[in-house]
Amino acid sequence: MSDILQKILAVKAEEVAAARKHRDLPSVRAEAEANRHDSTLGPRGFAQALRDKIGAGRAAVIAEVKKASPSKGVLRPDFKPAEIAGSYAEHGAACLSVLTDEQFFQGHADYLREARAACALPALRKDFMVDLYQVYEARSWGADCILLIVSALDQGLMAELEACAHELGMDVLVEVHDGHELERALRLSTPLVGVNNRNLRTFETTLDTTLGLLKHMPDDRIVVTESGILKPDDVRKMRAADVNAFLVGEAFMRADDPGTELARLFA
């Protein structure tokens, strides 16, 4: 595990402990379960939205709403989540990914609420999930999917978090970087496997990470390539290998209009 990831996970444990004191687990769980049947906040079907795009022969883009990152600093000083989400929806995104980590990515729960309310797209809570509390919290905020990072979790906890998400009607995107992590991810039932092309130890990025893992990927999984998709040639390279789902953030966040950049990149 990288030093930065260890640091983030330590902070997450502290955040969860503090959140539990502010609002106990039964309260969060009750809100999450109530939201499941709410006409506005009920789950929108994240995995199905990706399948629909791919089935129509198009790239399935998970468009990220991200103000900053630890490695790149502030990406978008004029950060308006609702406006960004609306632009993504207008220009063909399949889903949203919204950063809710405050300390390292300058995200916030309100950004998830605002982005999701601004359009009809399903939304991923992009954060470092280490506790069941966060899963209930995600659904209480309206999240349709959570991220599980294999390198951050032991197998038992990862399975427990996945089961909780599915019980609440959410999908799960499980993230890997190498063959060992993929083997662990495939023990879960989720069809969504994200391959992070960025090495969290060195921060080097190569699309060969996704391409190298494809031969080990079962046909029933949807591969989501993450990080390093910066130009149309990157998209063509992935689609030529039958990778049709993409999580893109930085390229969009640095553009004047994120949705227009999405349309250009995936034209």
From Swiss-Prot:
Its EC number is 4.1.1.48. It catalyses: 1-(2-carboxyphenylamino)-1-deoxy-D-ribulose 5-phosphate + H(+) = (1S,2R)-1-C-(indol-3-yl)glycerol 3-phosphate + CO2 + H2O. HAMAP family: IGPS_B. PROSITE patterns: IGPS (PS00614). Signal peptide: none annotated. GO terms for molecular function: indole-3-glycerol-phosphate synthase activity; phosphoribosylanthranilate isomerase activity. Belongs to the TrpC family. InterPro entries: Aldolase_TIM (IPR013785), Indole-3-glycerol_P_synth (IPR045186), Indole-3-glycerol_P_synth_dom (IPR013798), Indole-3-GlycerolPSynthase_CS (IPR001468), RibuloseP-bd_barrel (IPR011060). This is Indole-3-glycerol phosphate synthase 1. Keywords: Amino-acid biosynthesis, Aromatic amino acid biosynthesis, Decarboxylase, Lyase, Tryptophan biosynthesis. Pathway: Amino-acid biosynthesis; L-tryptophan biosynthesis; L-tryptophan from chorismate: step 4/5. GO terms for biological process: L-tryptophan biosynthetic process.
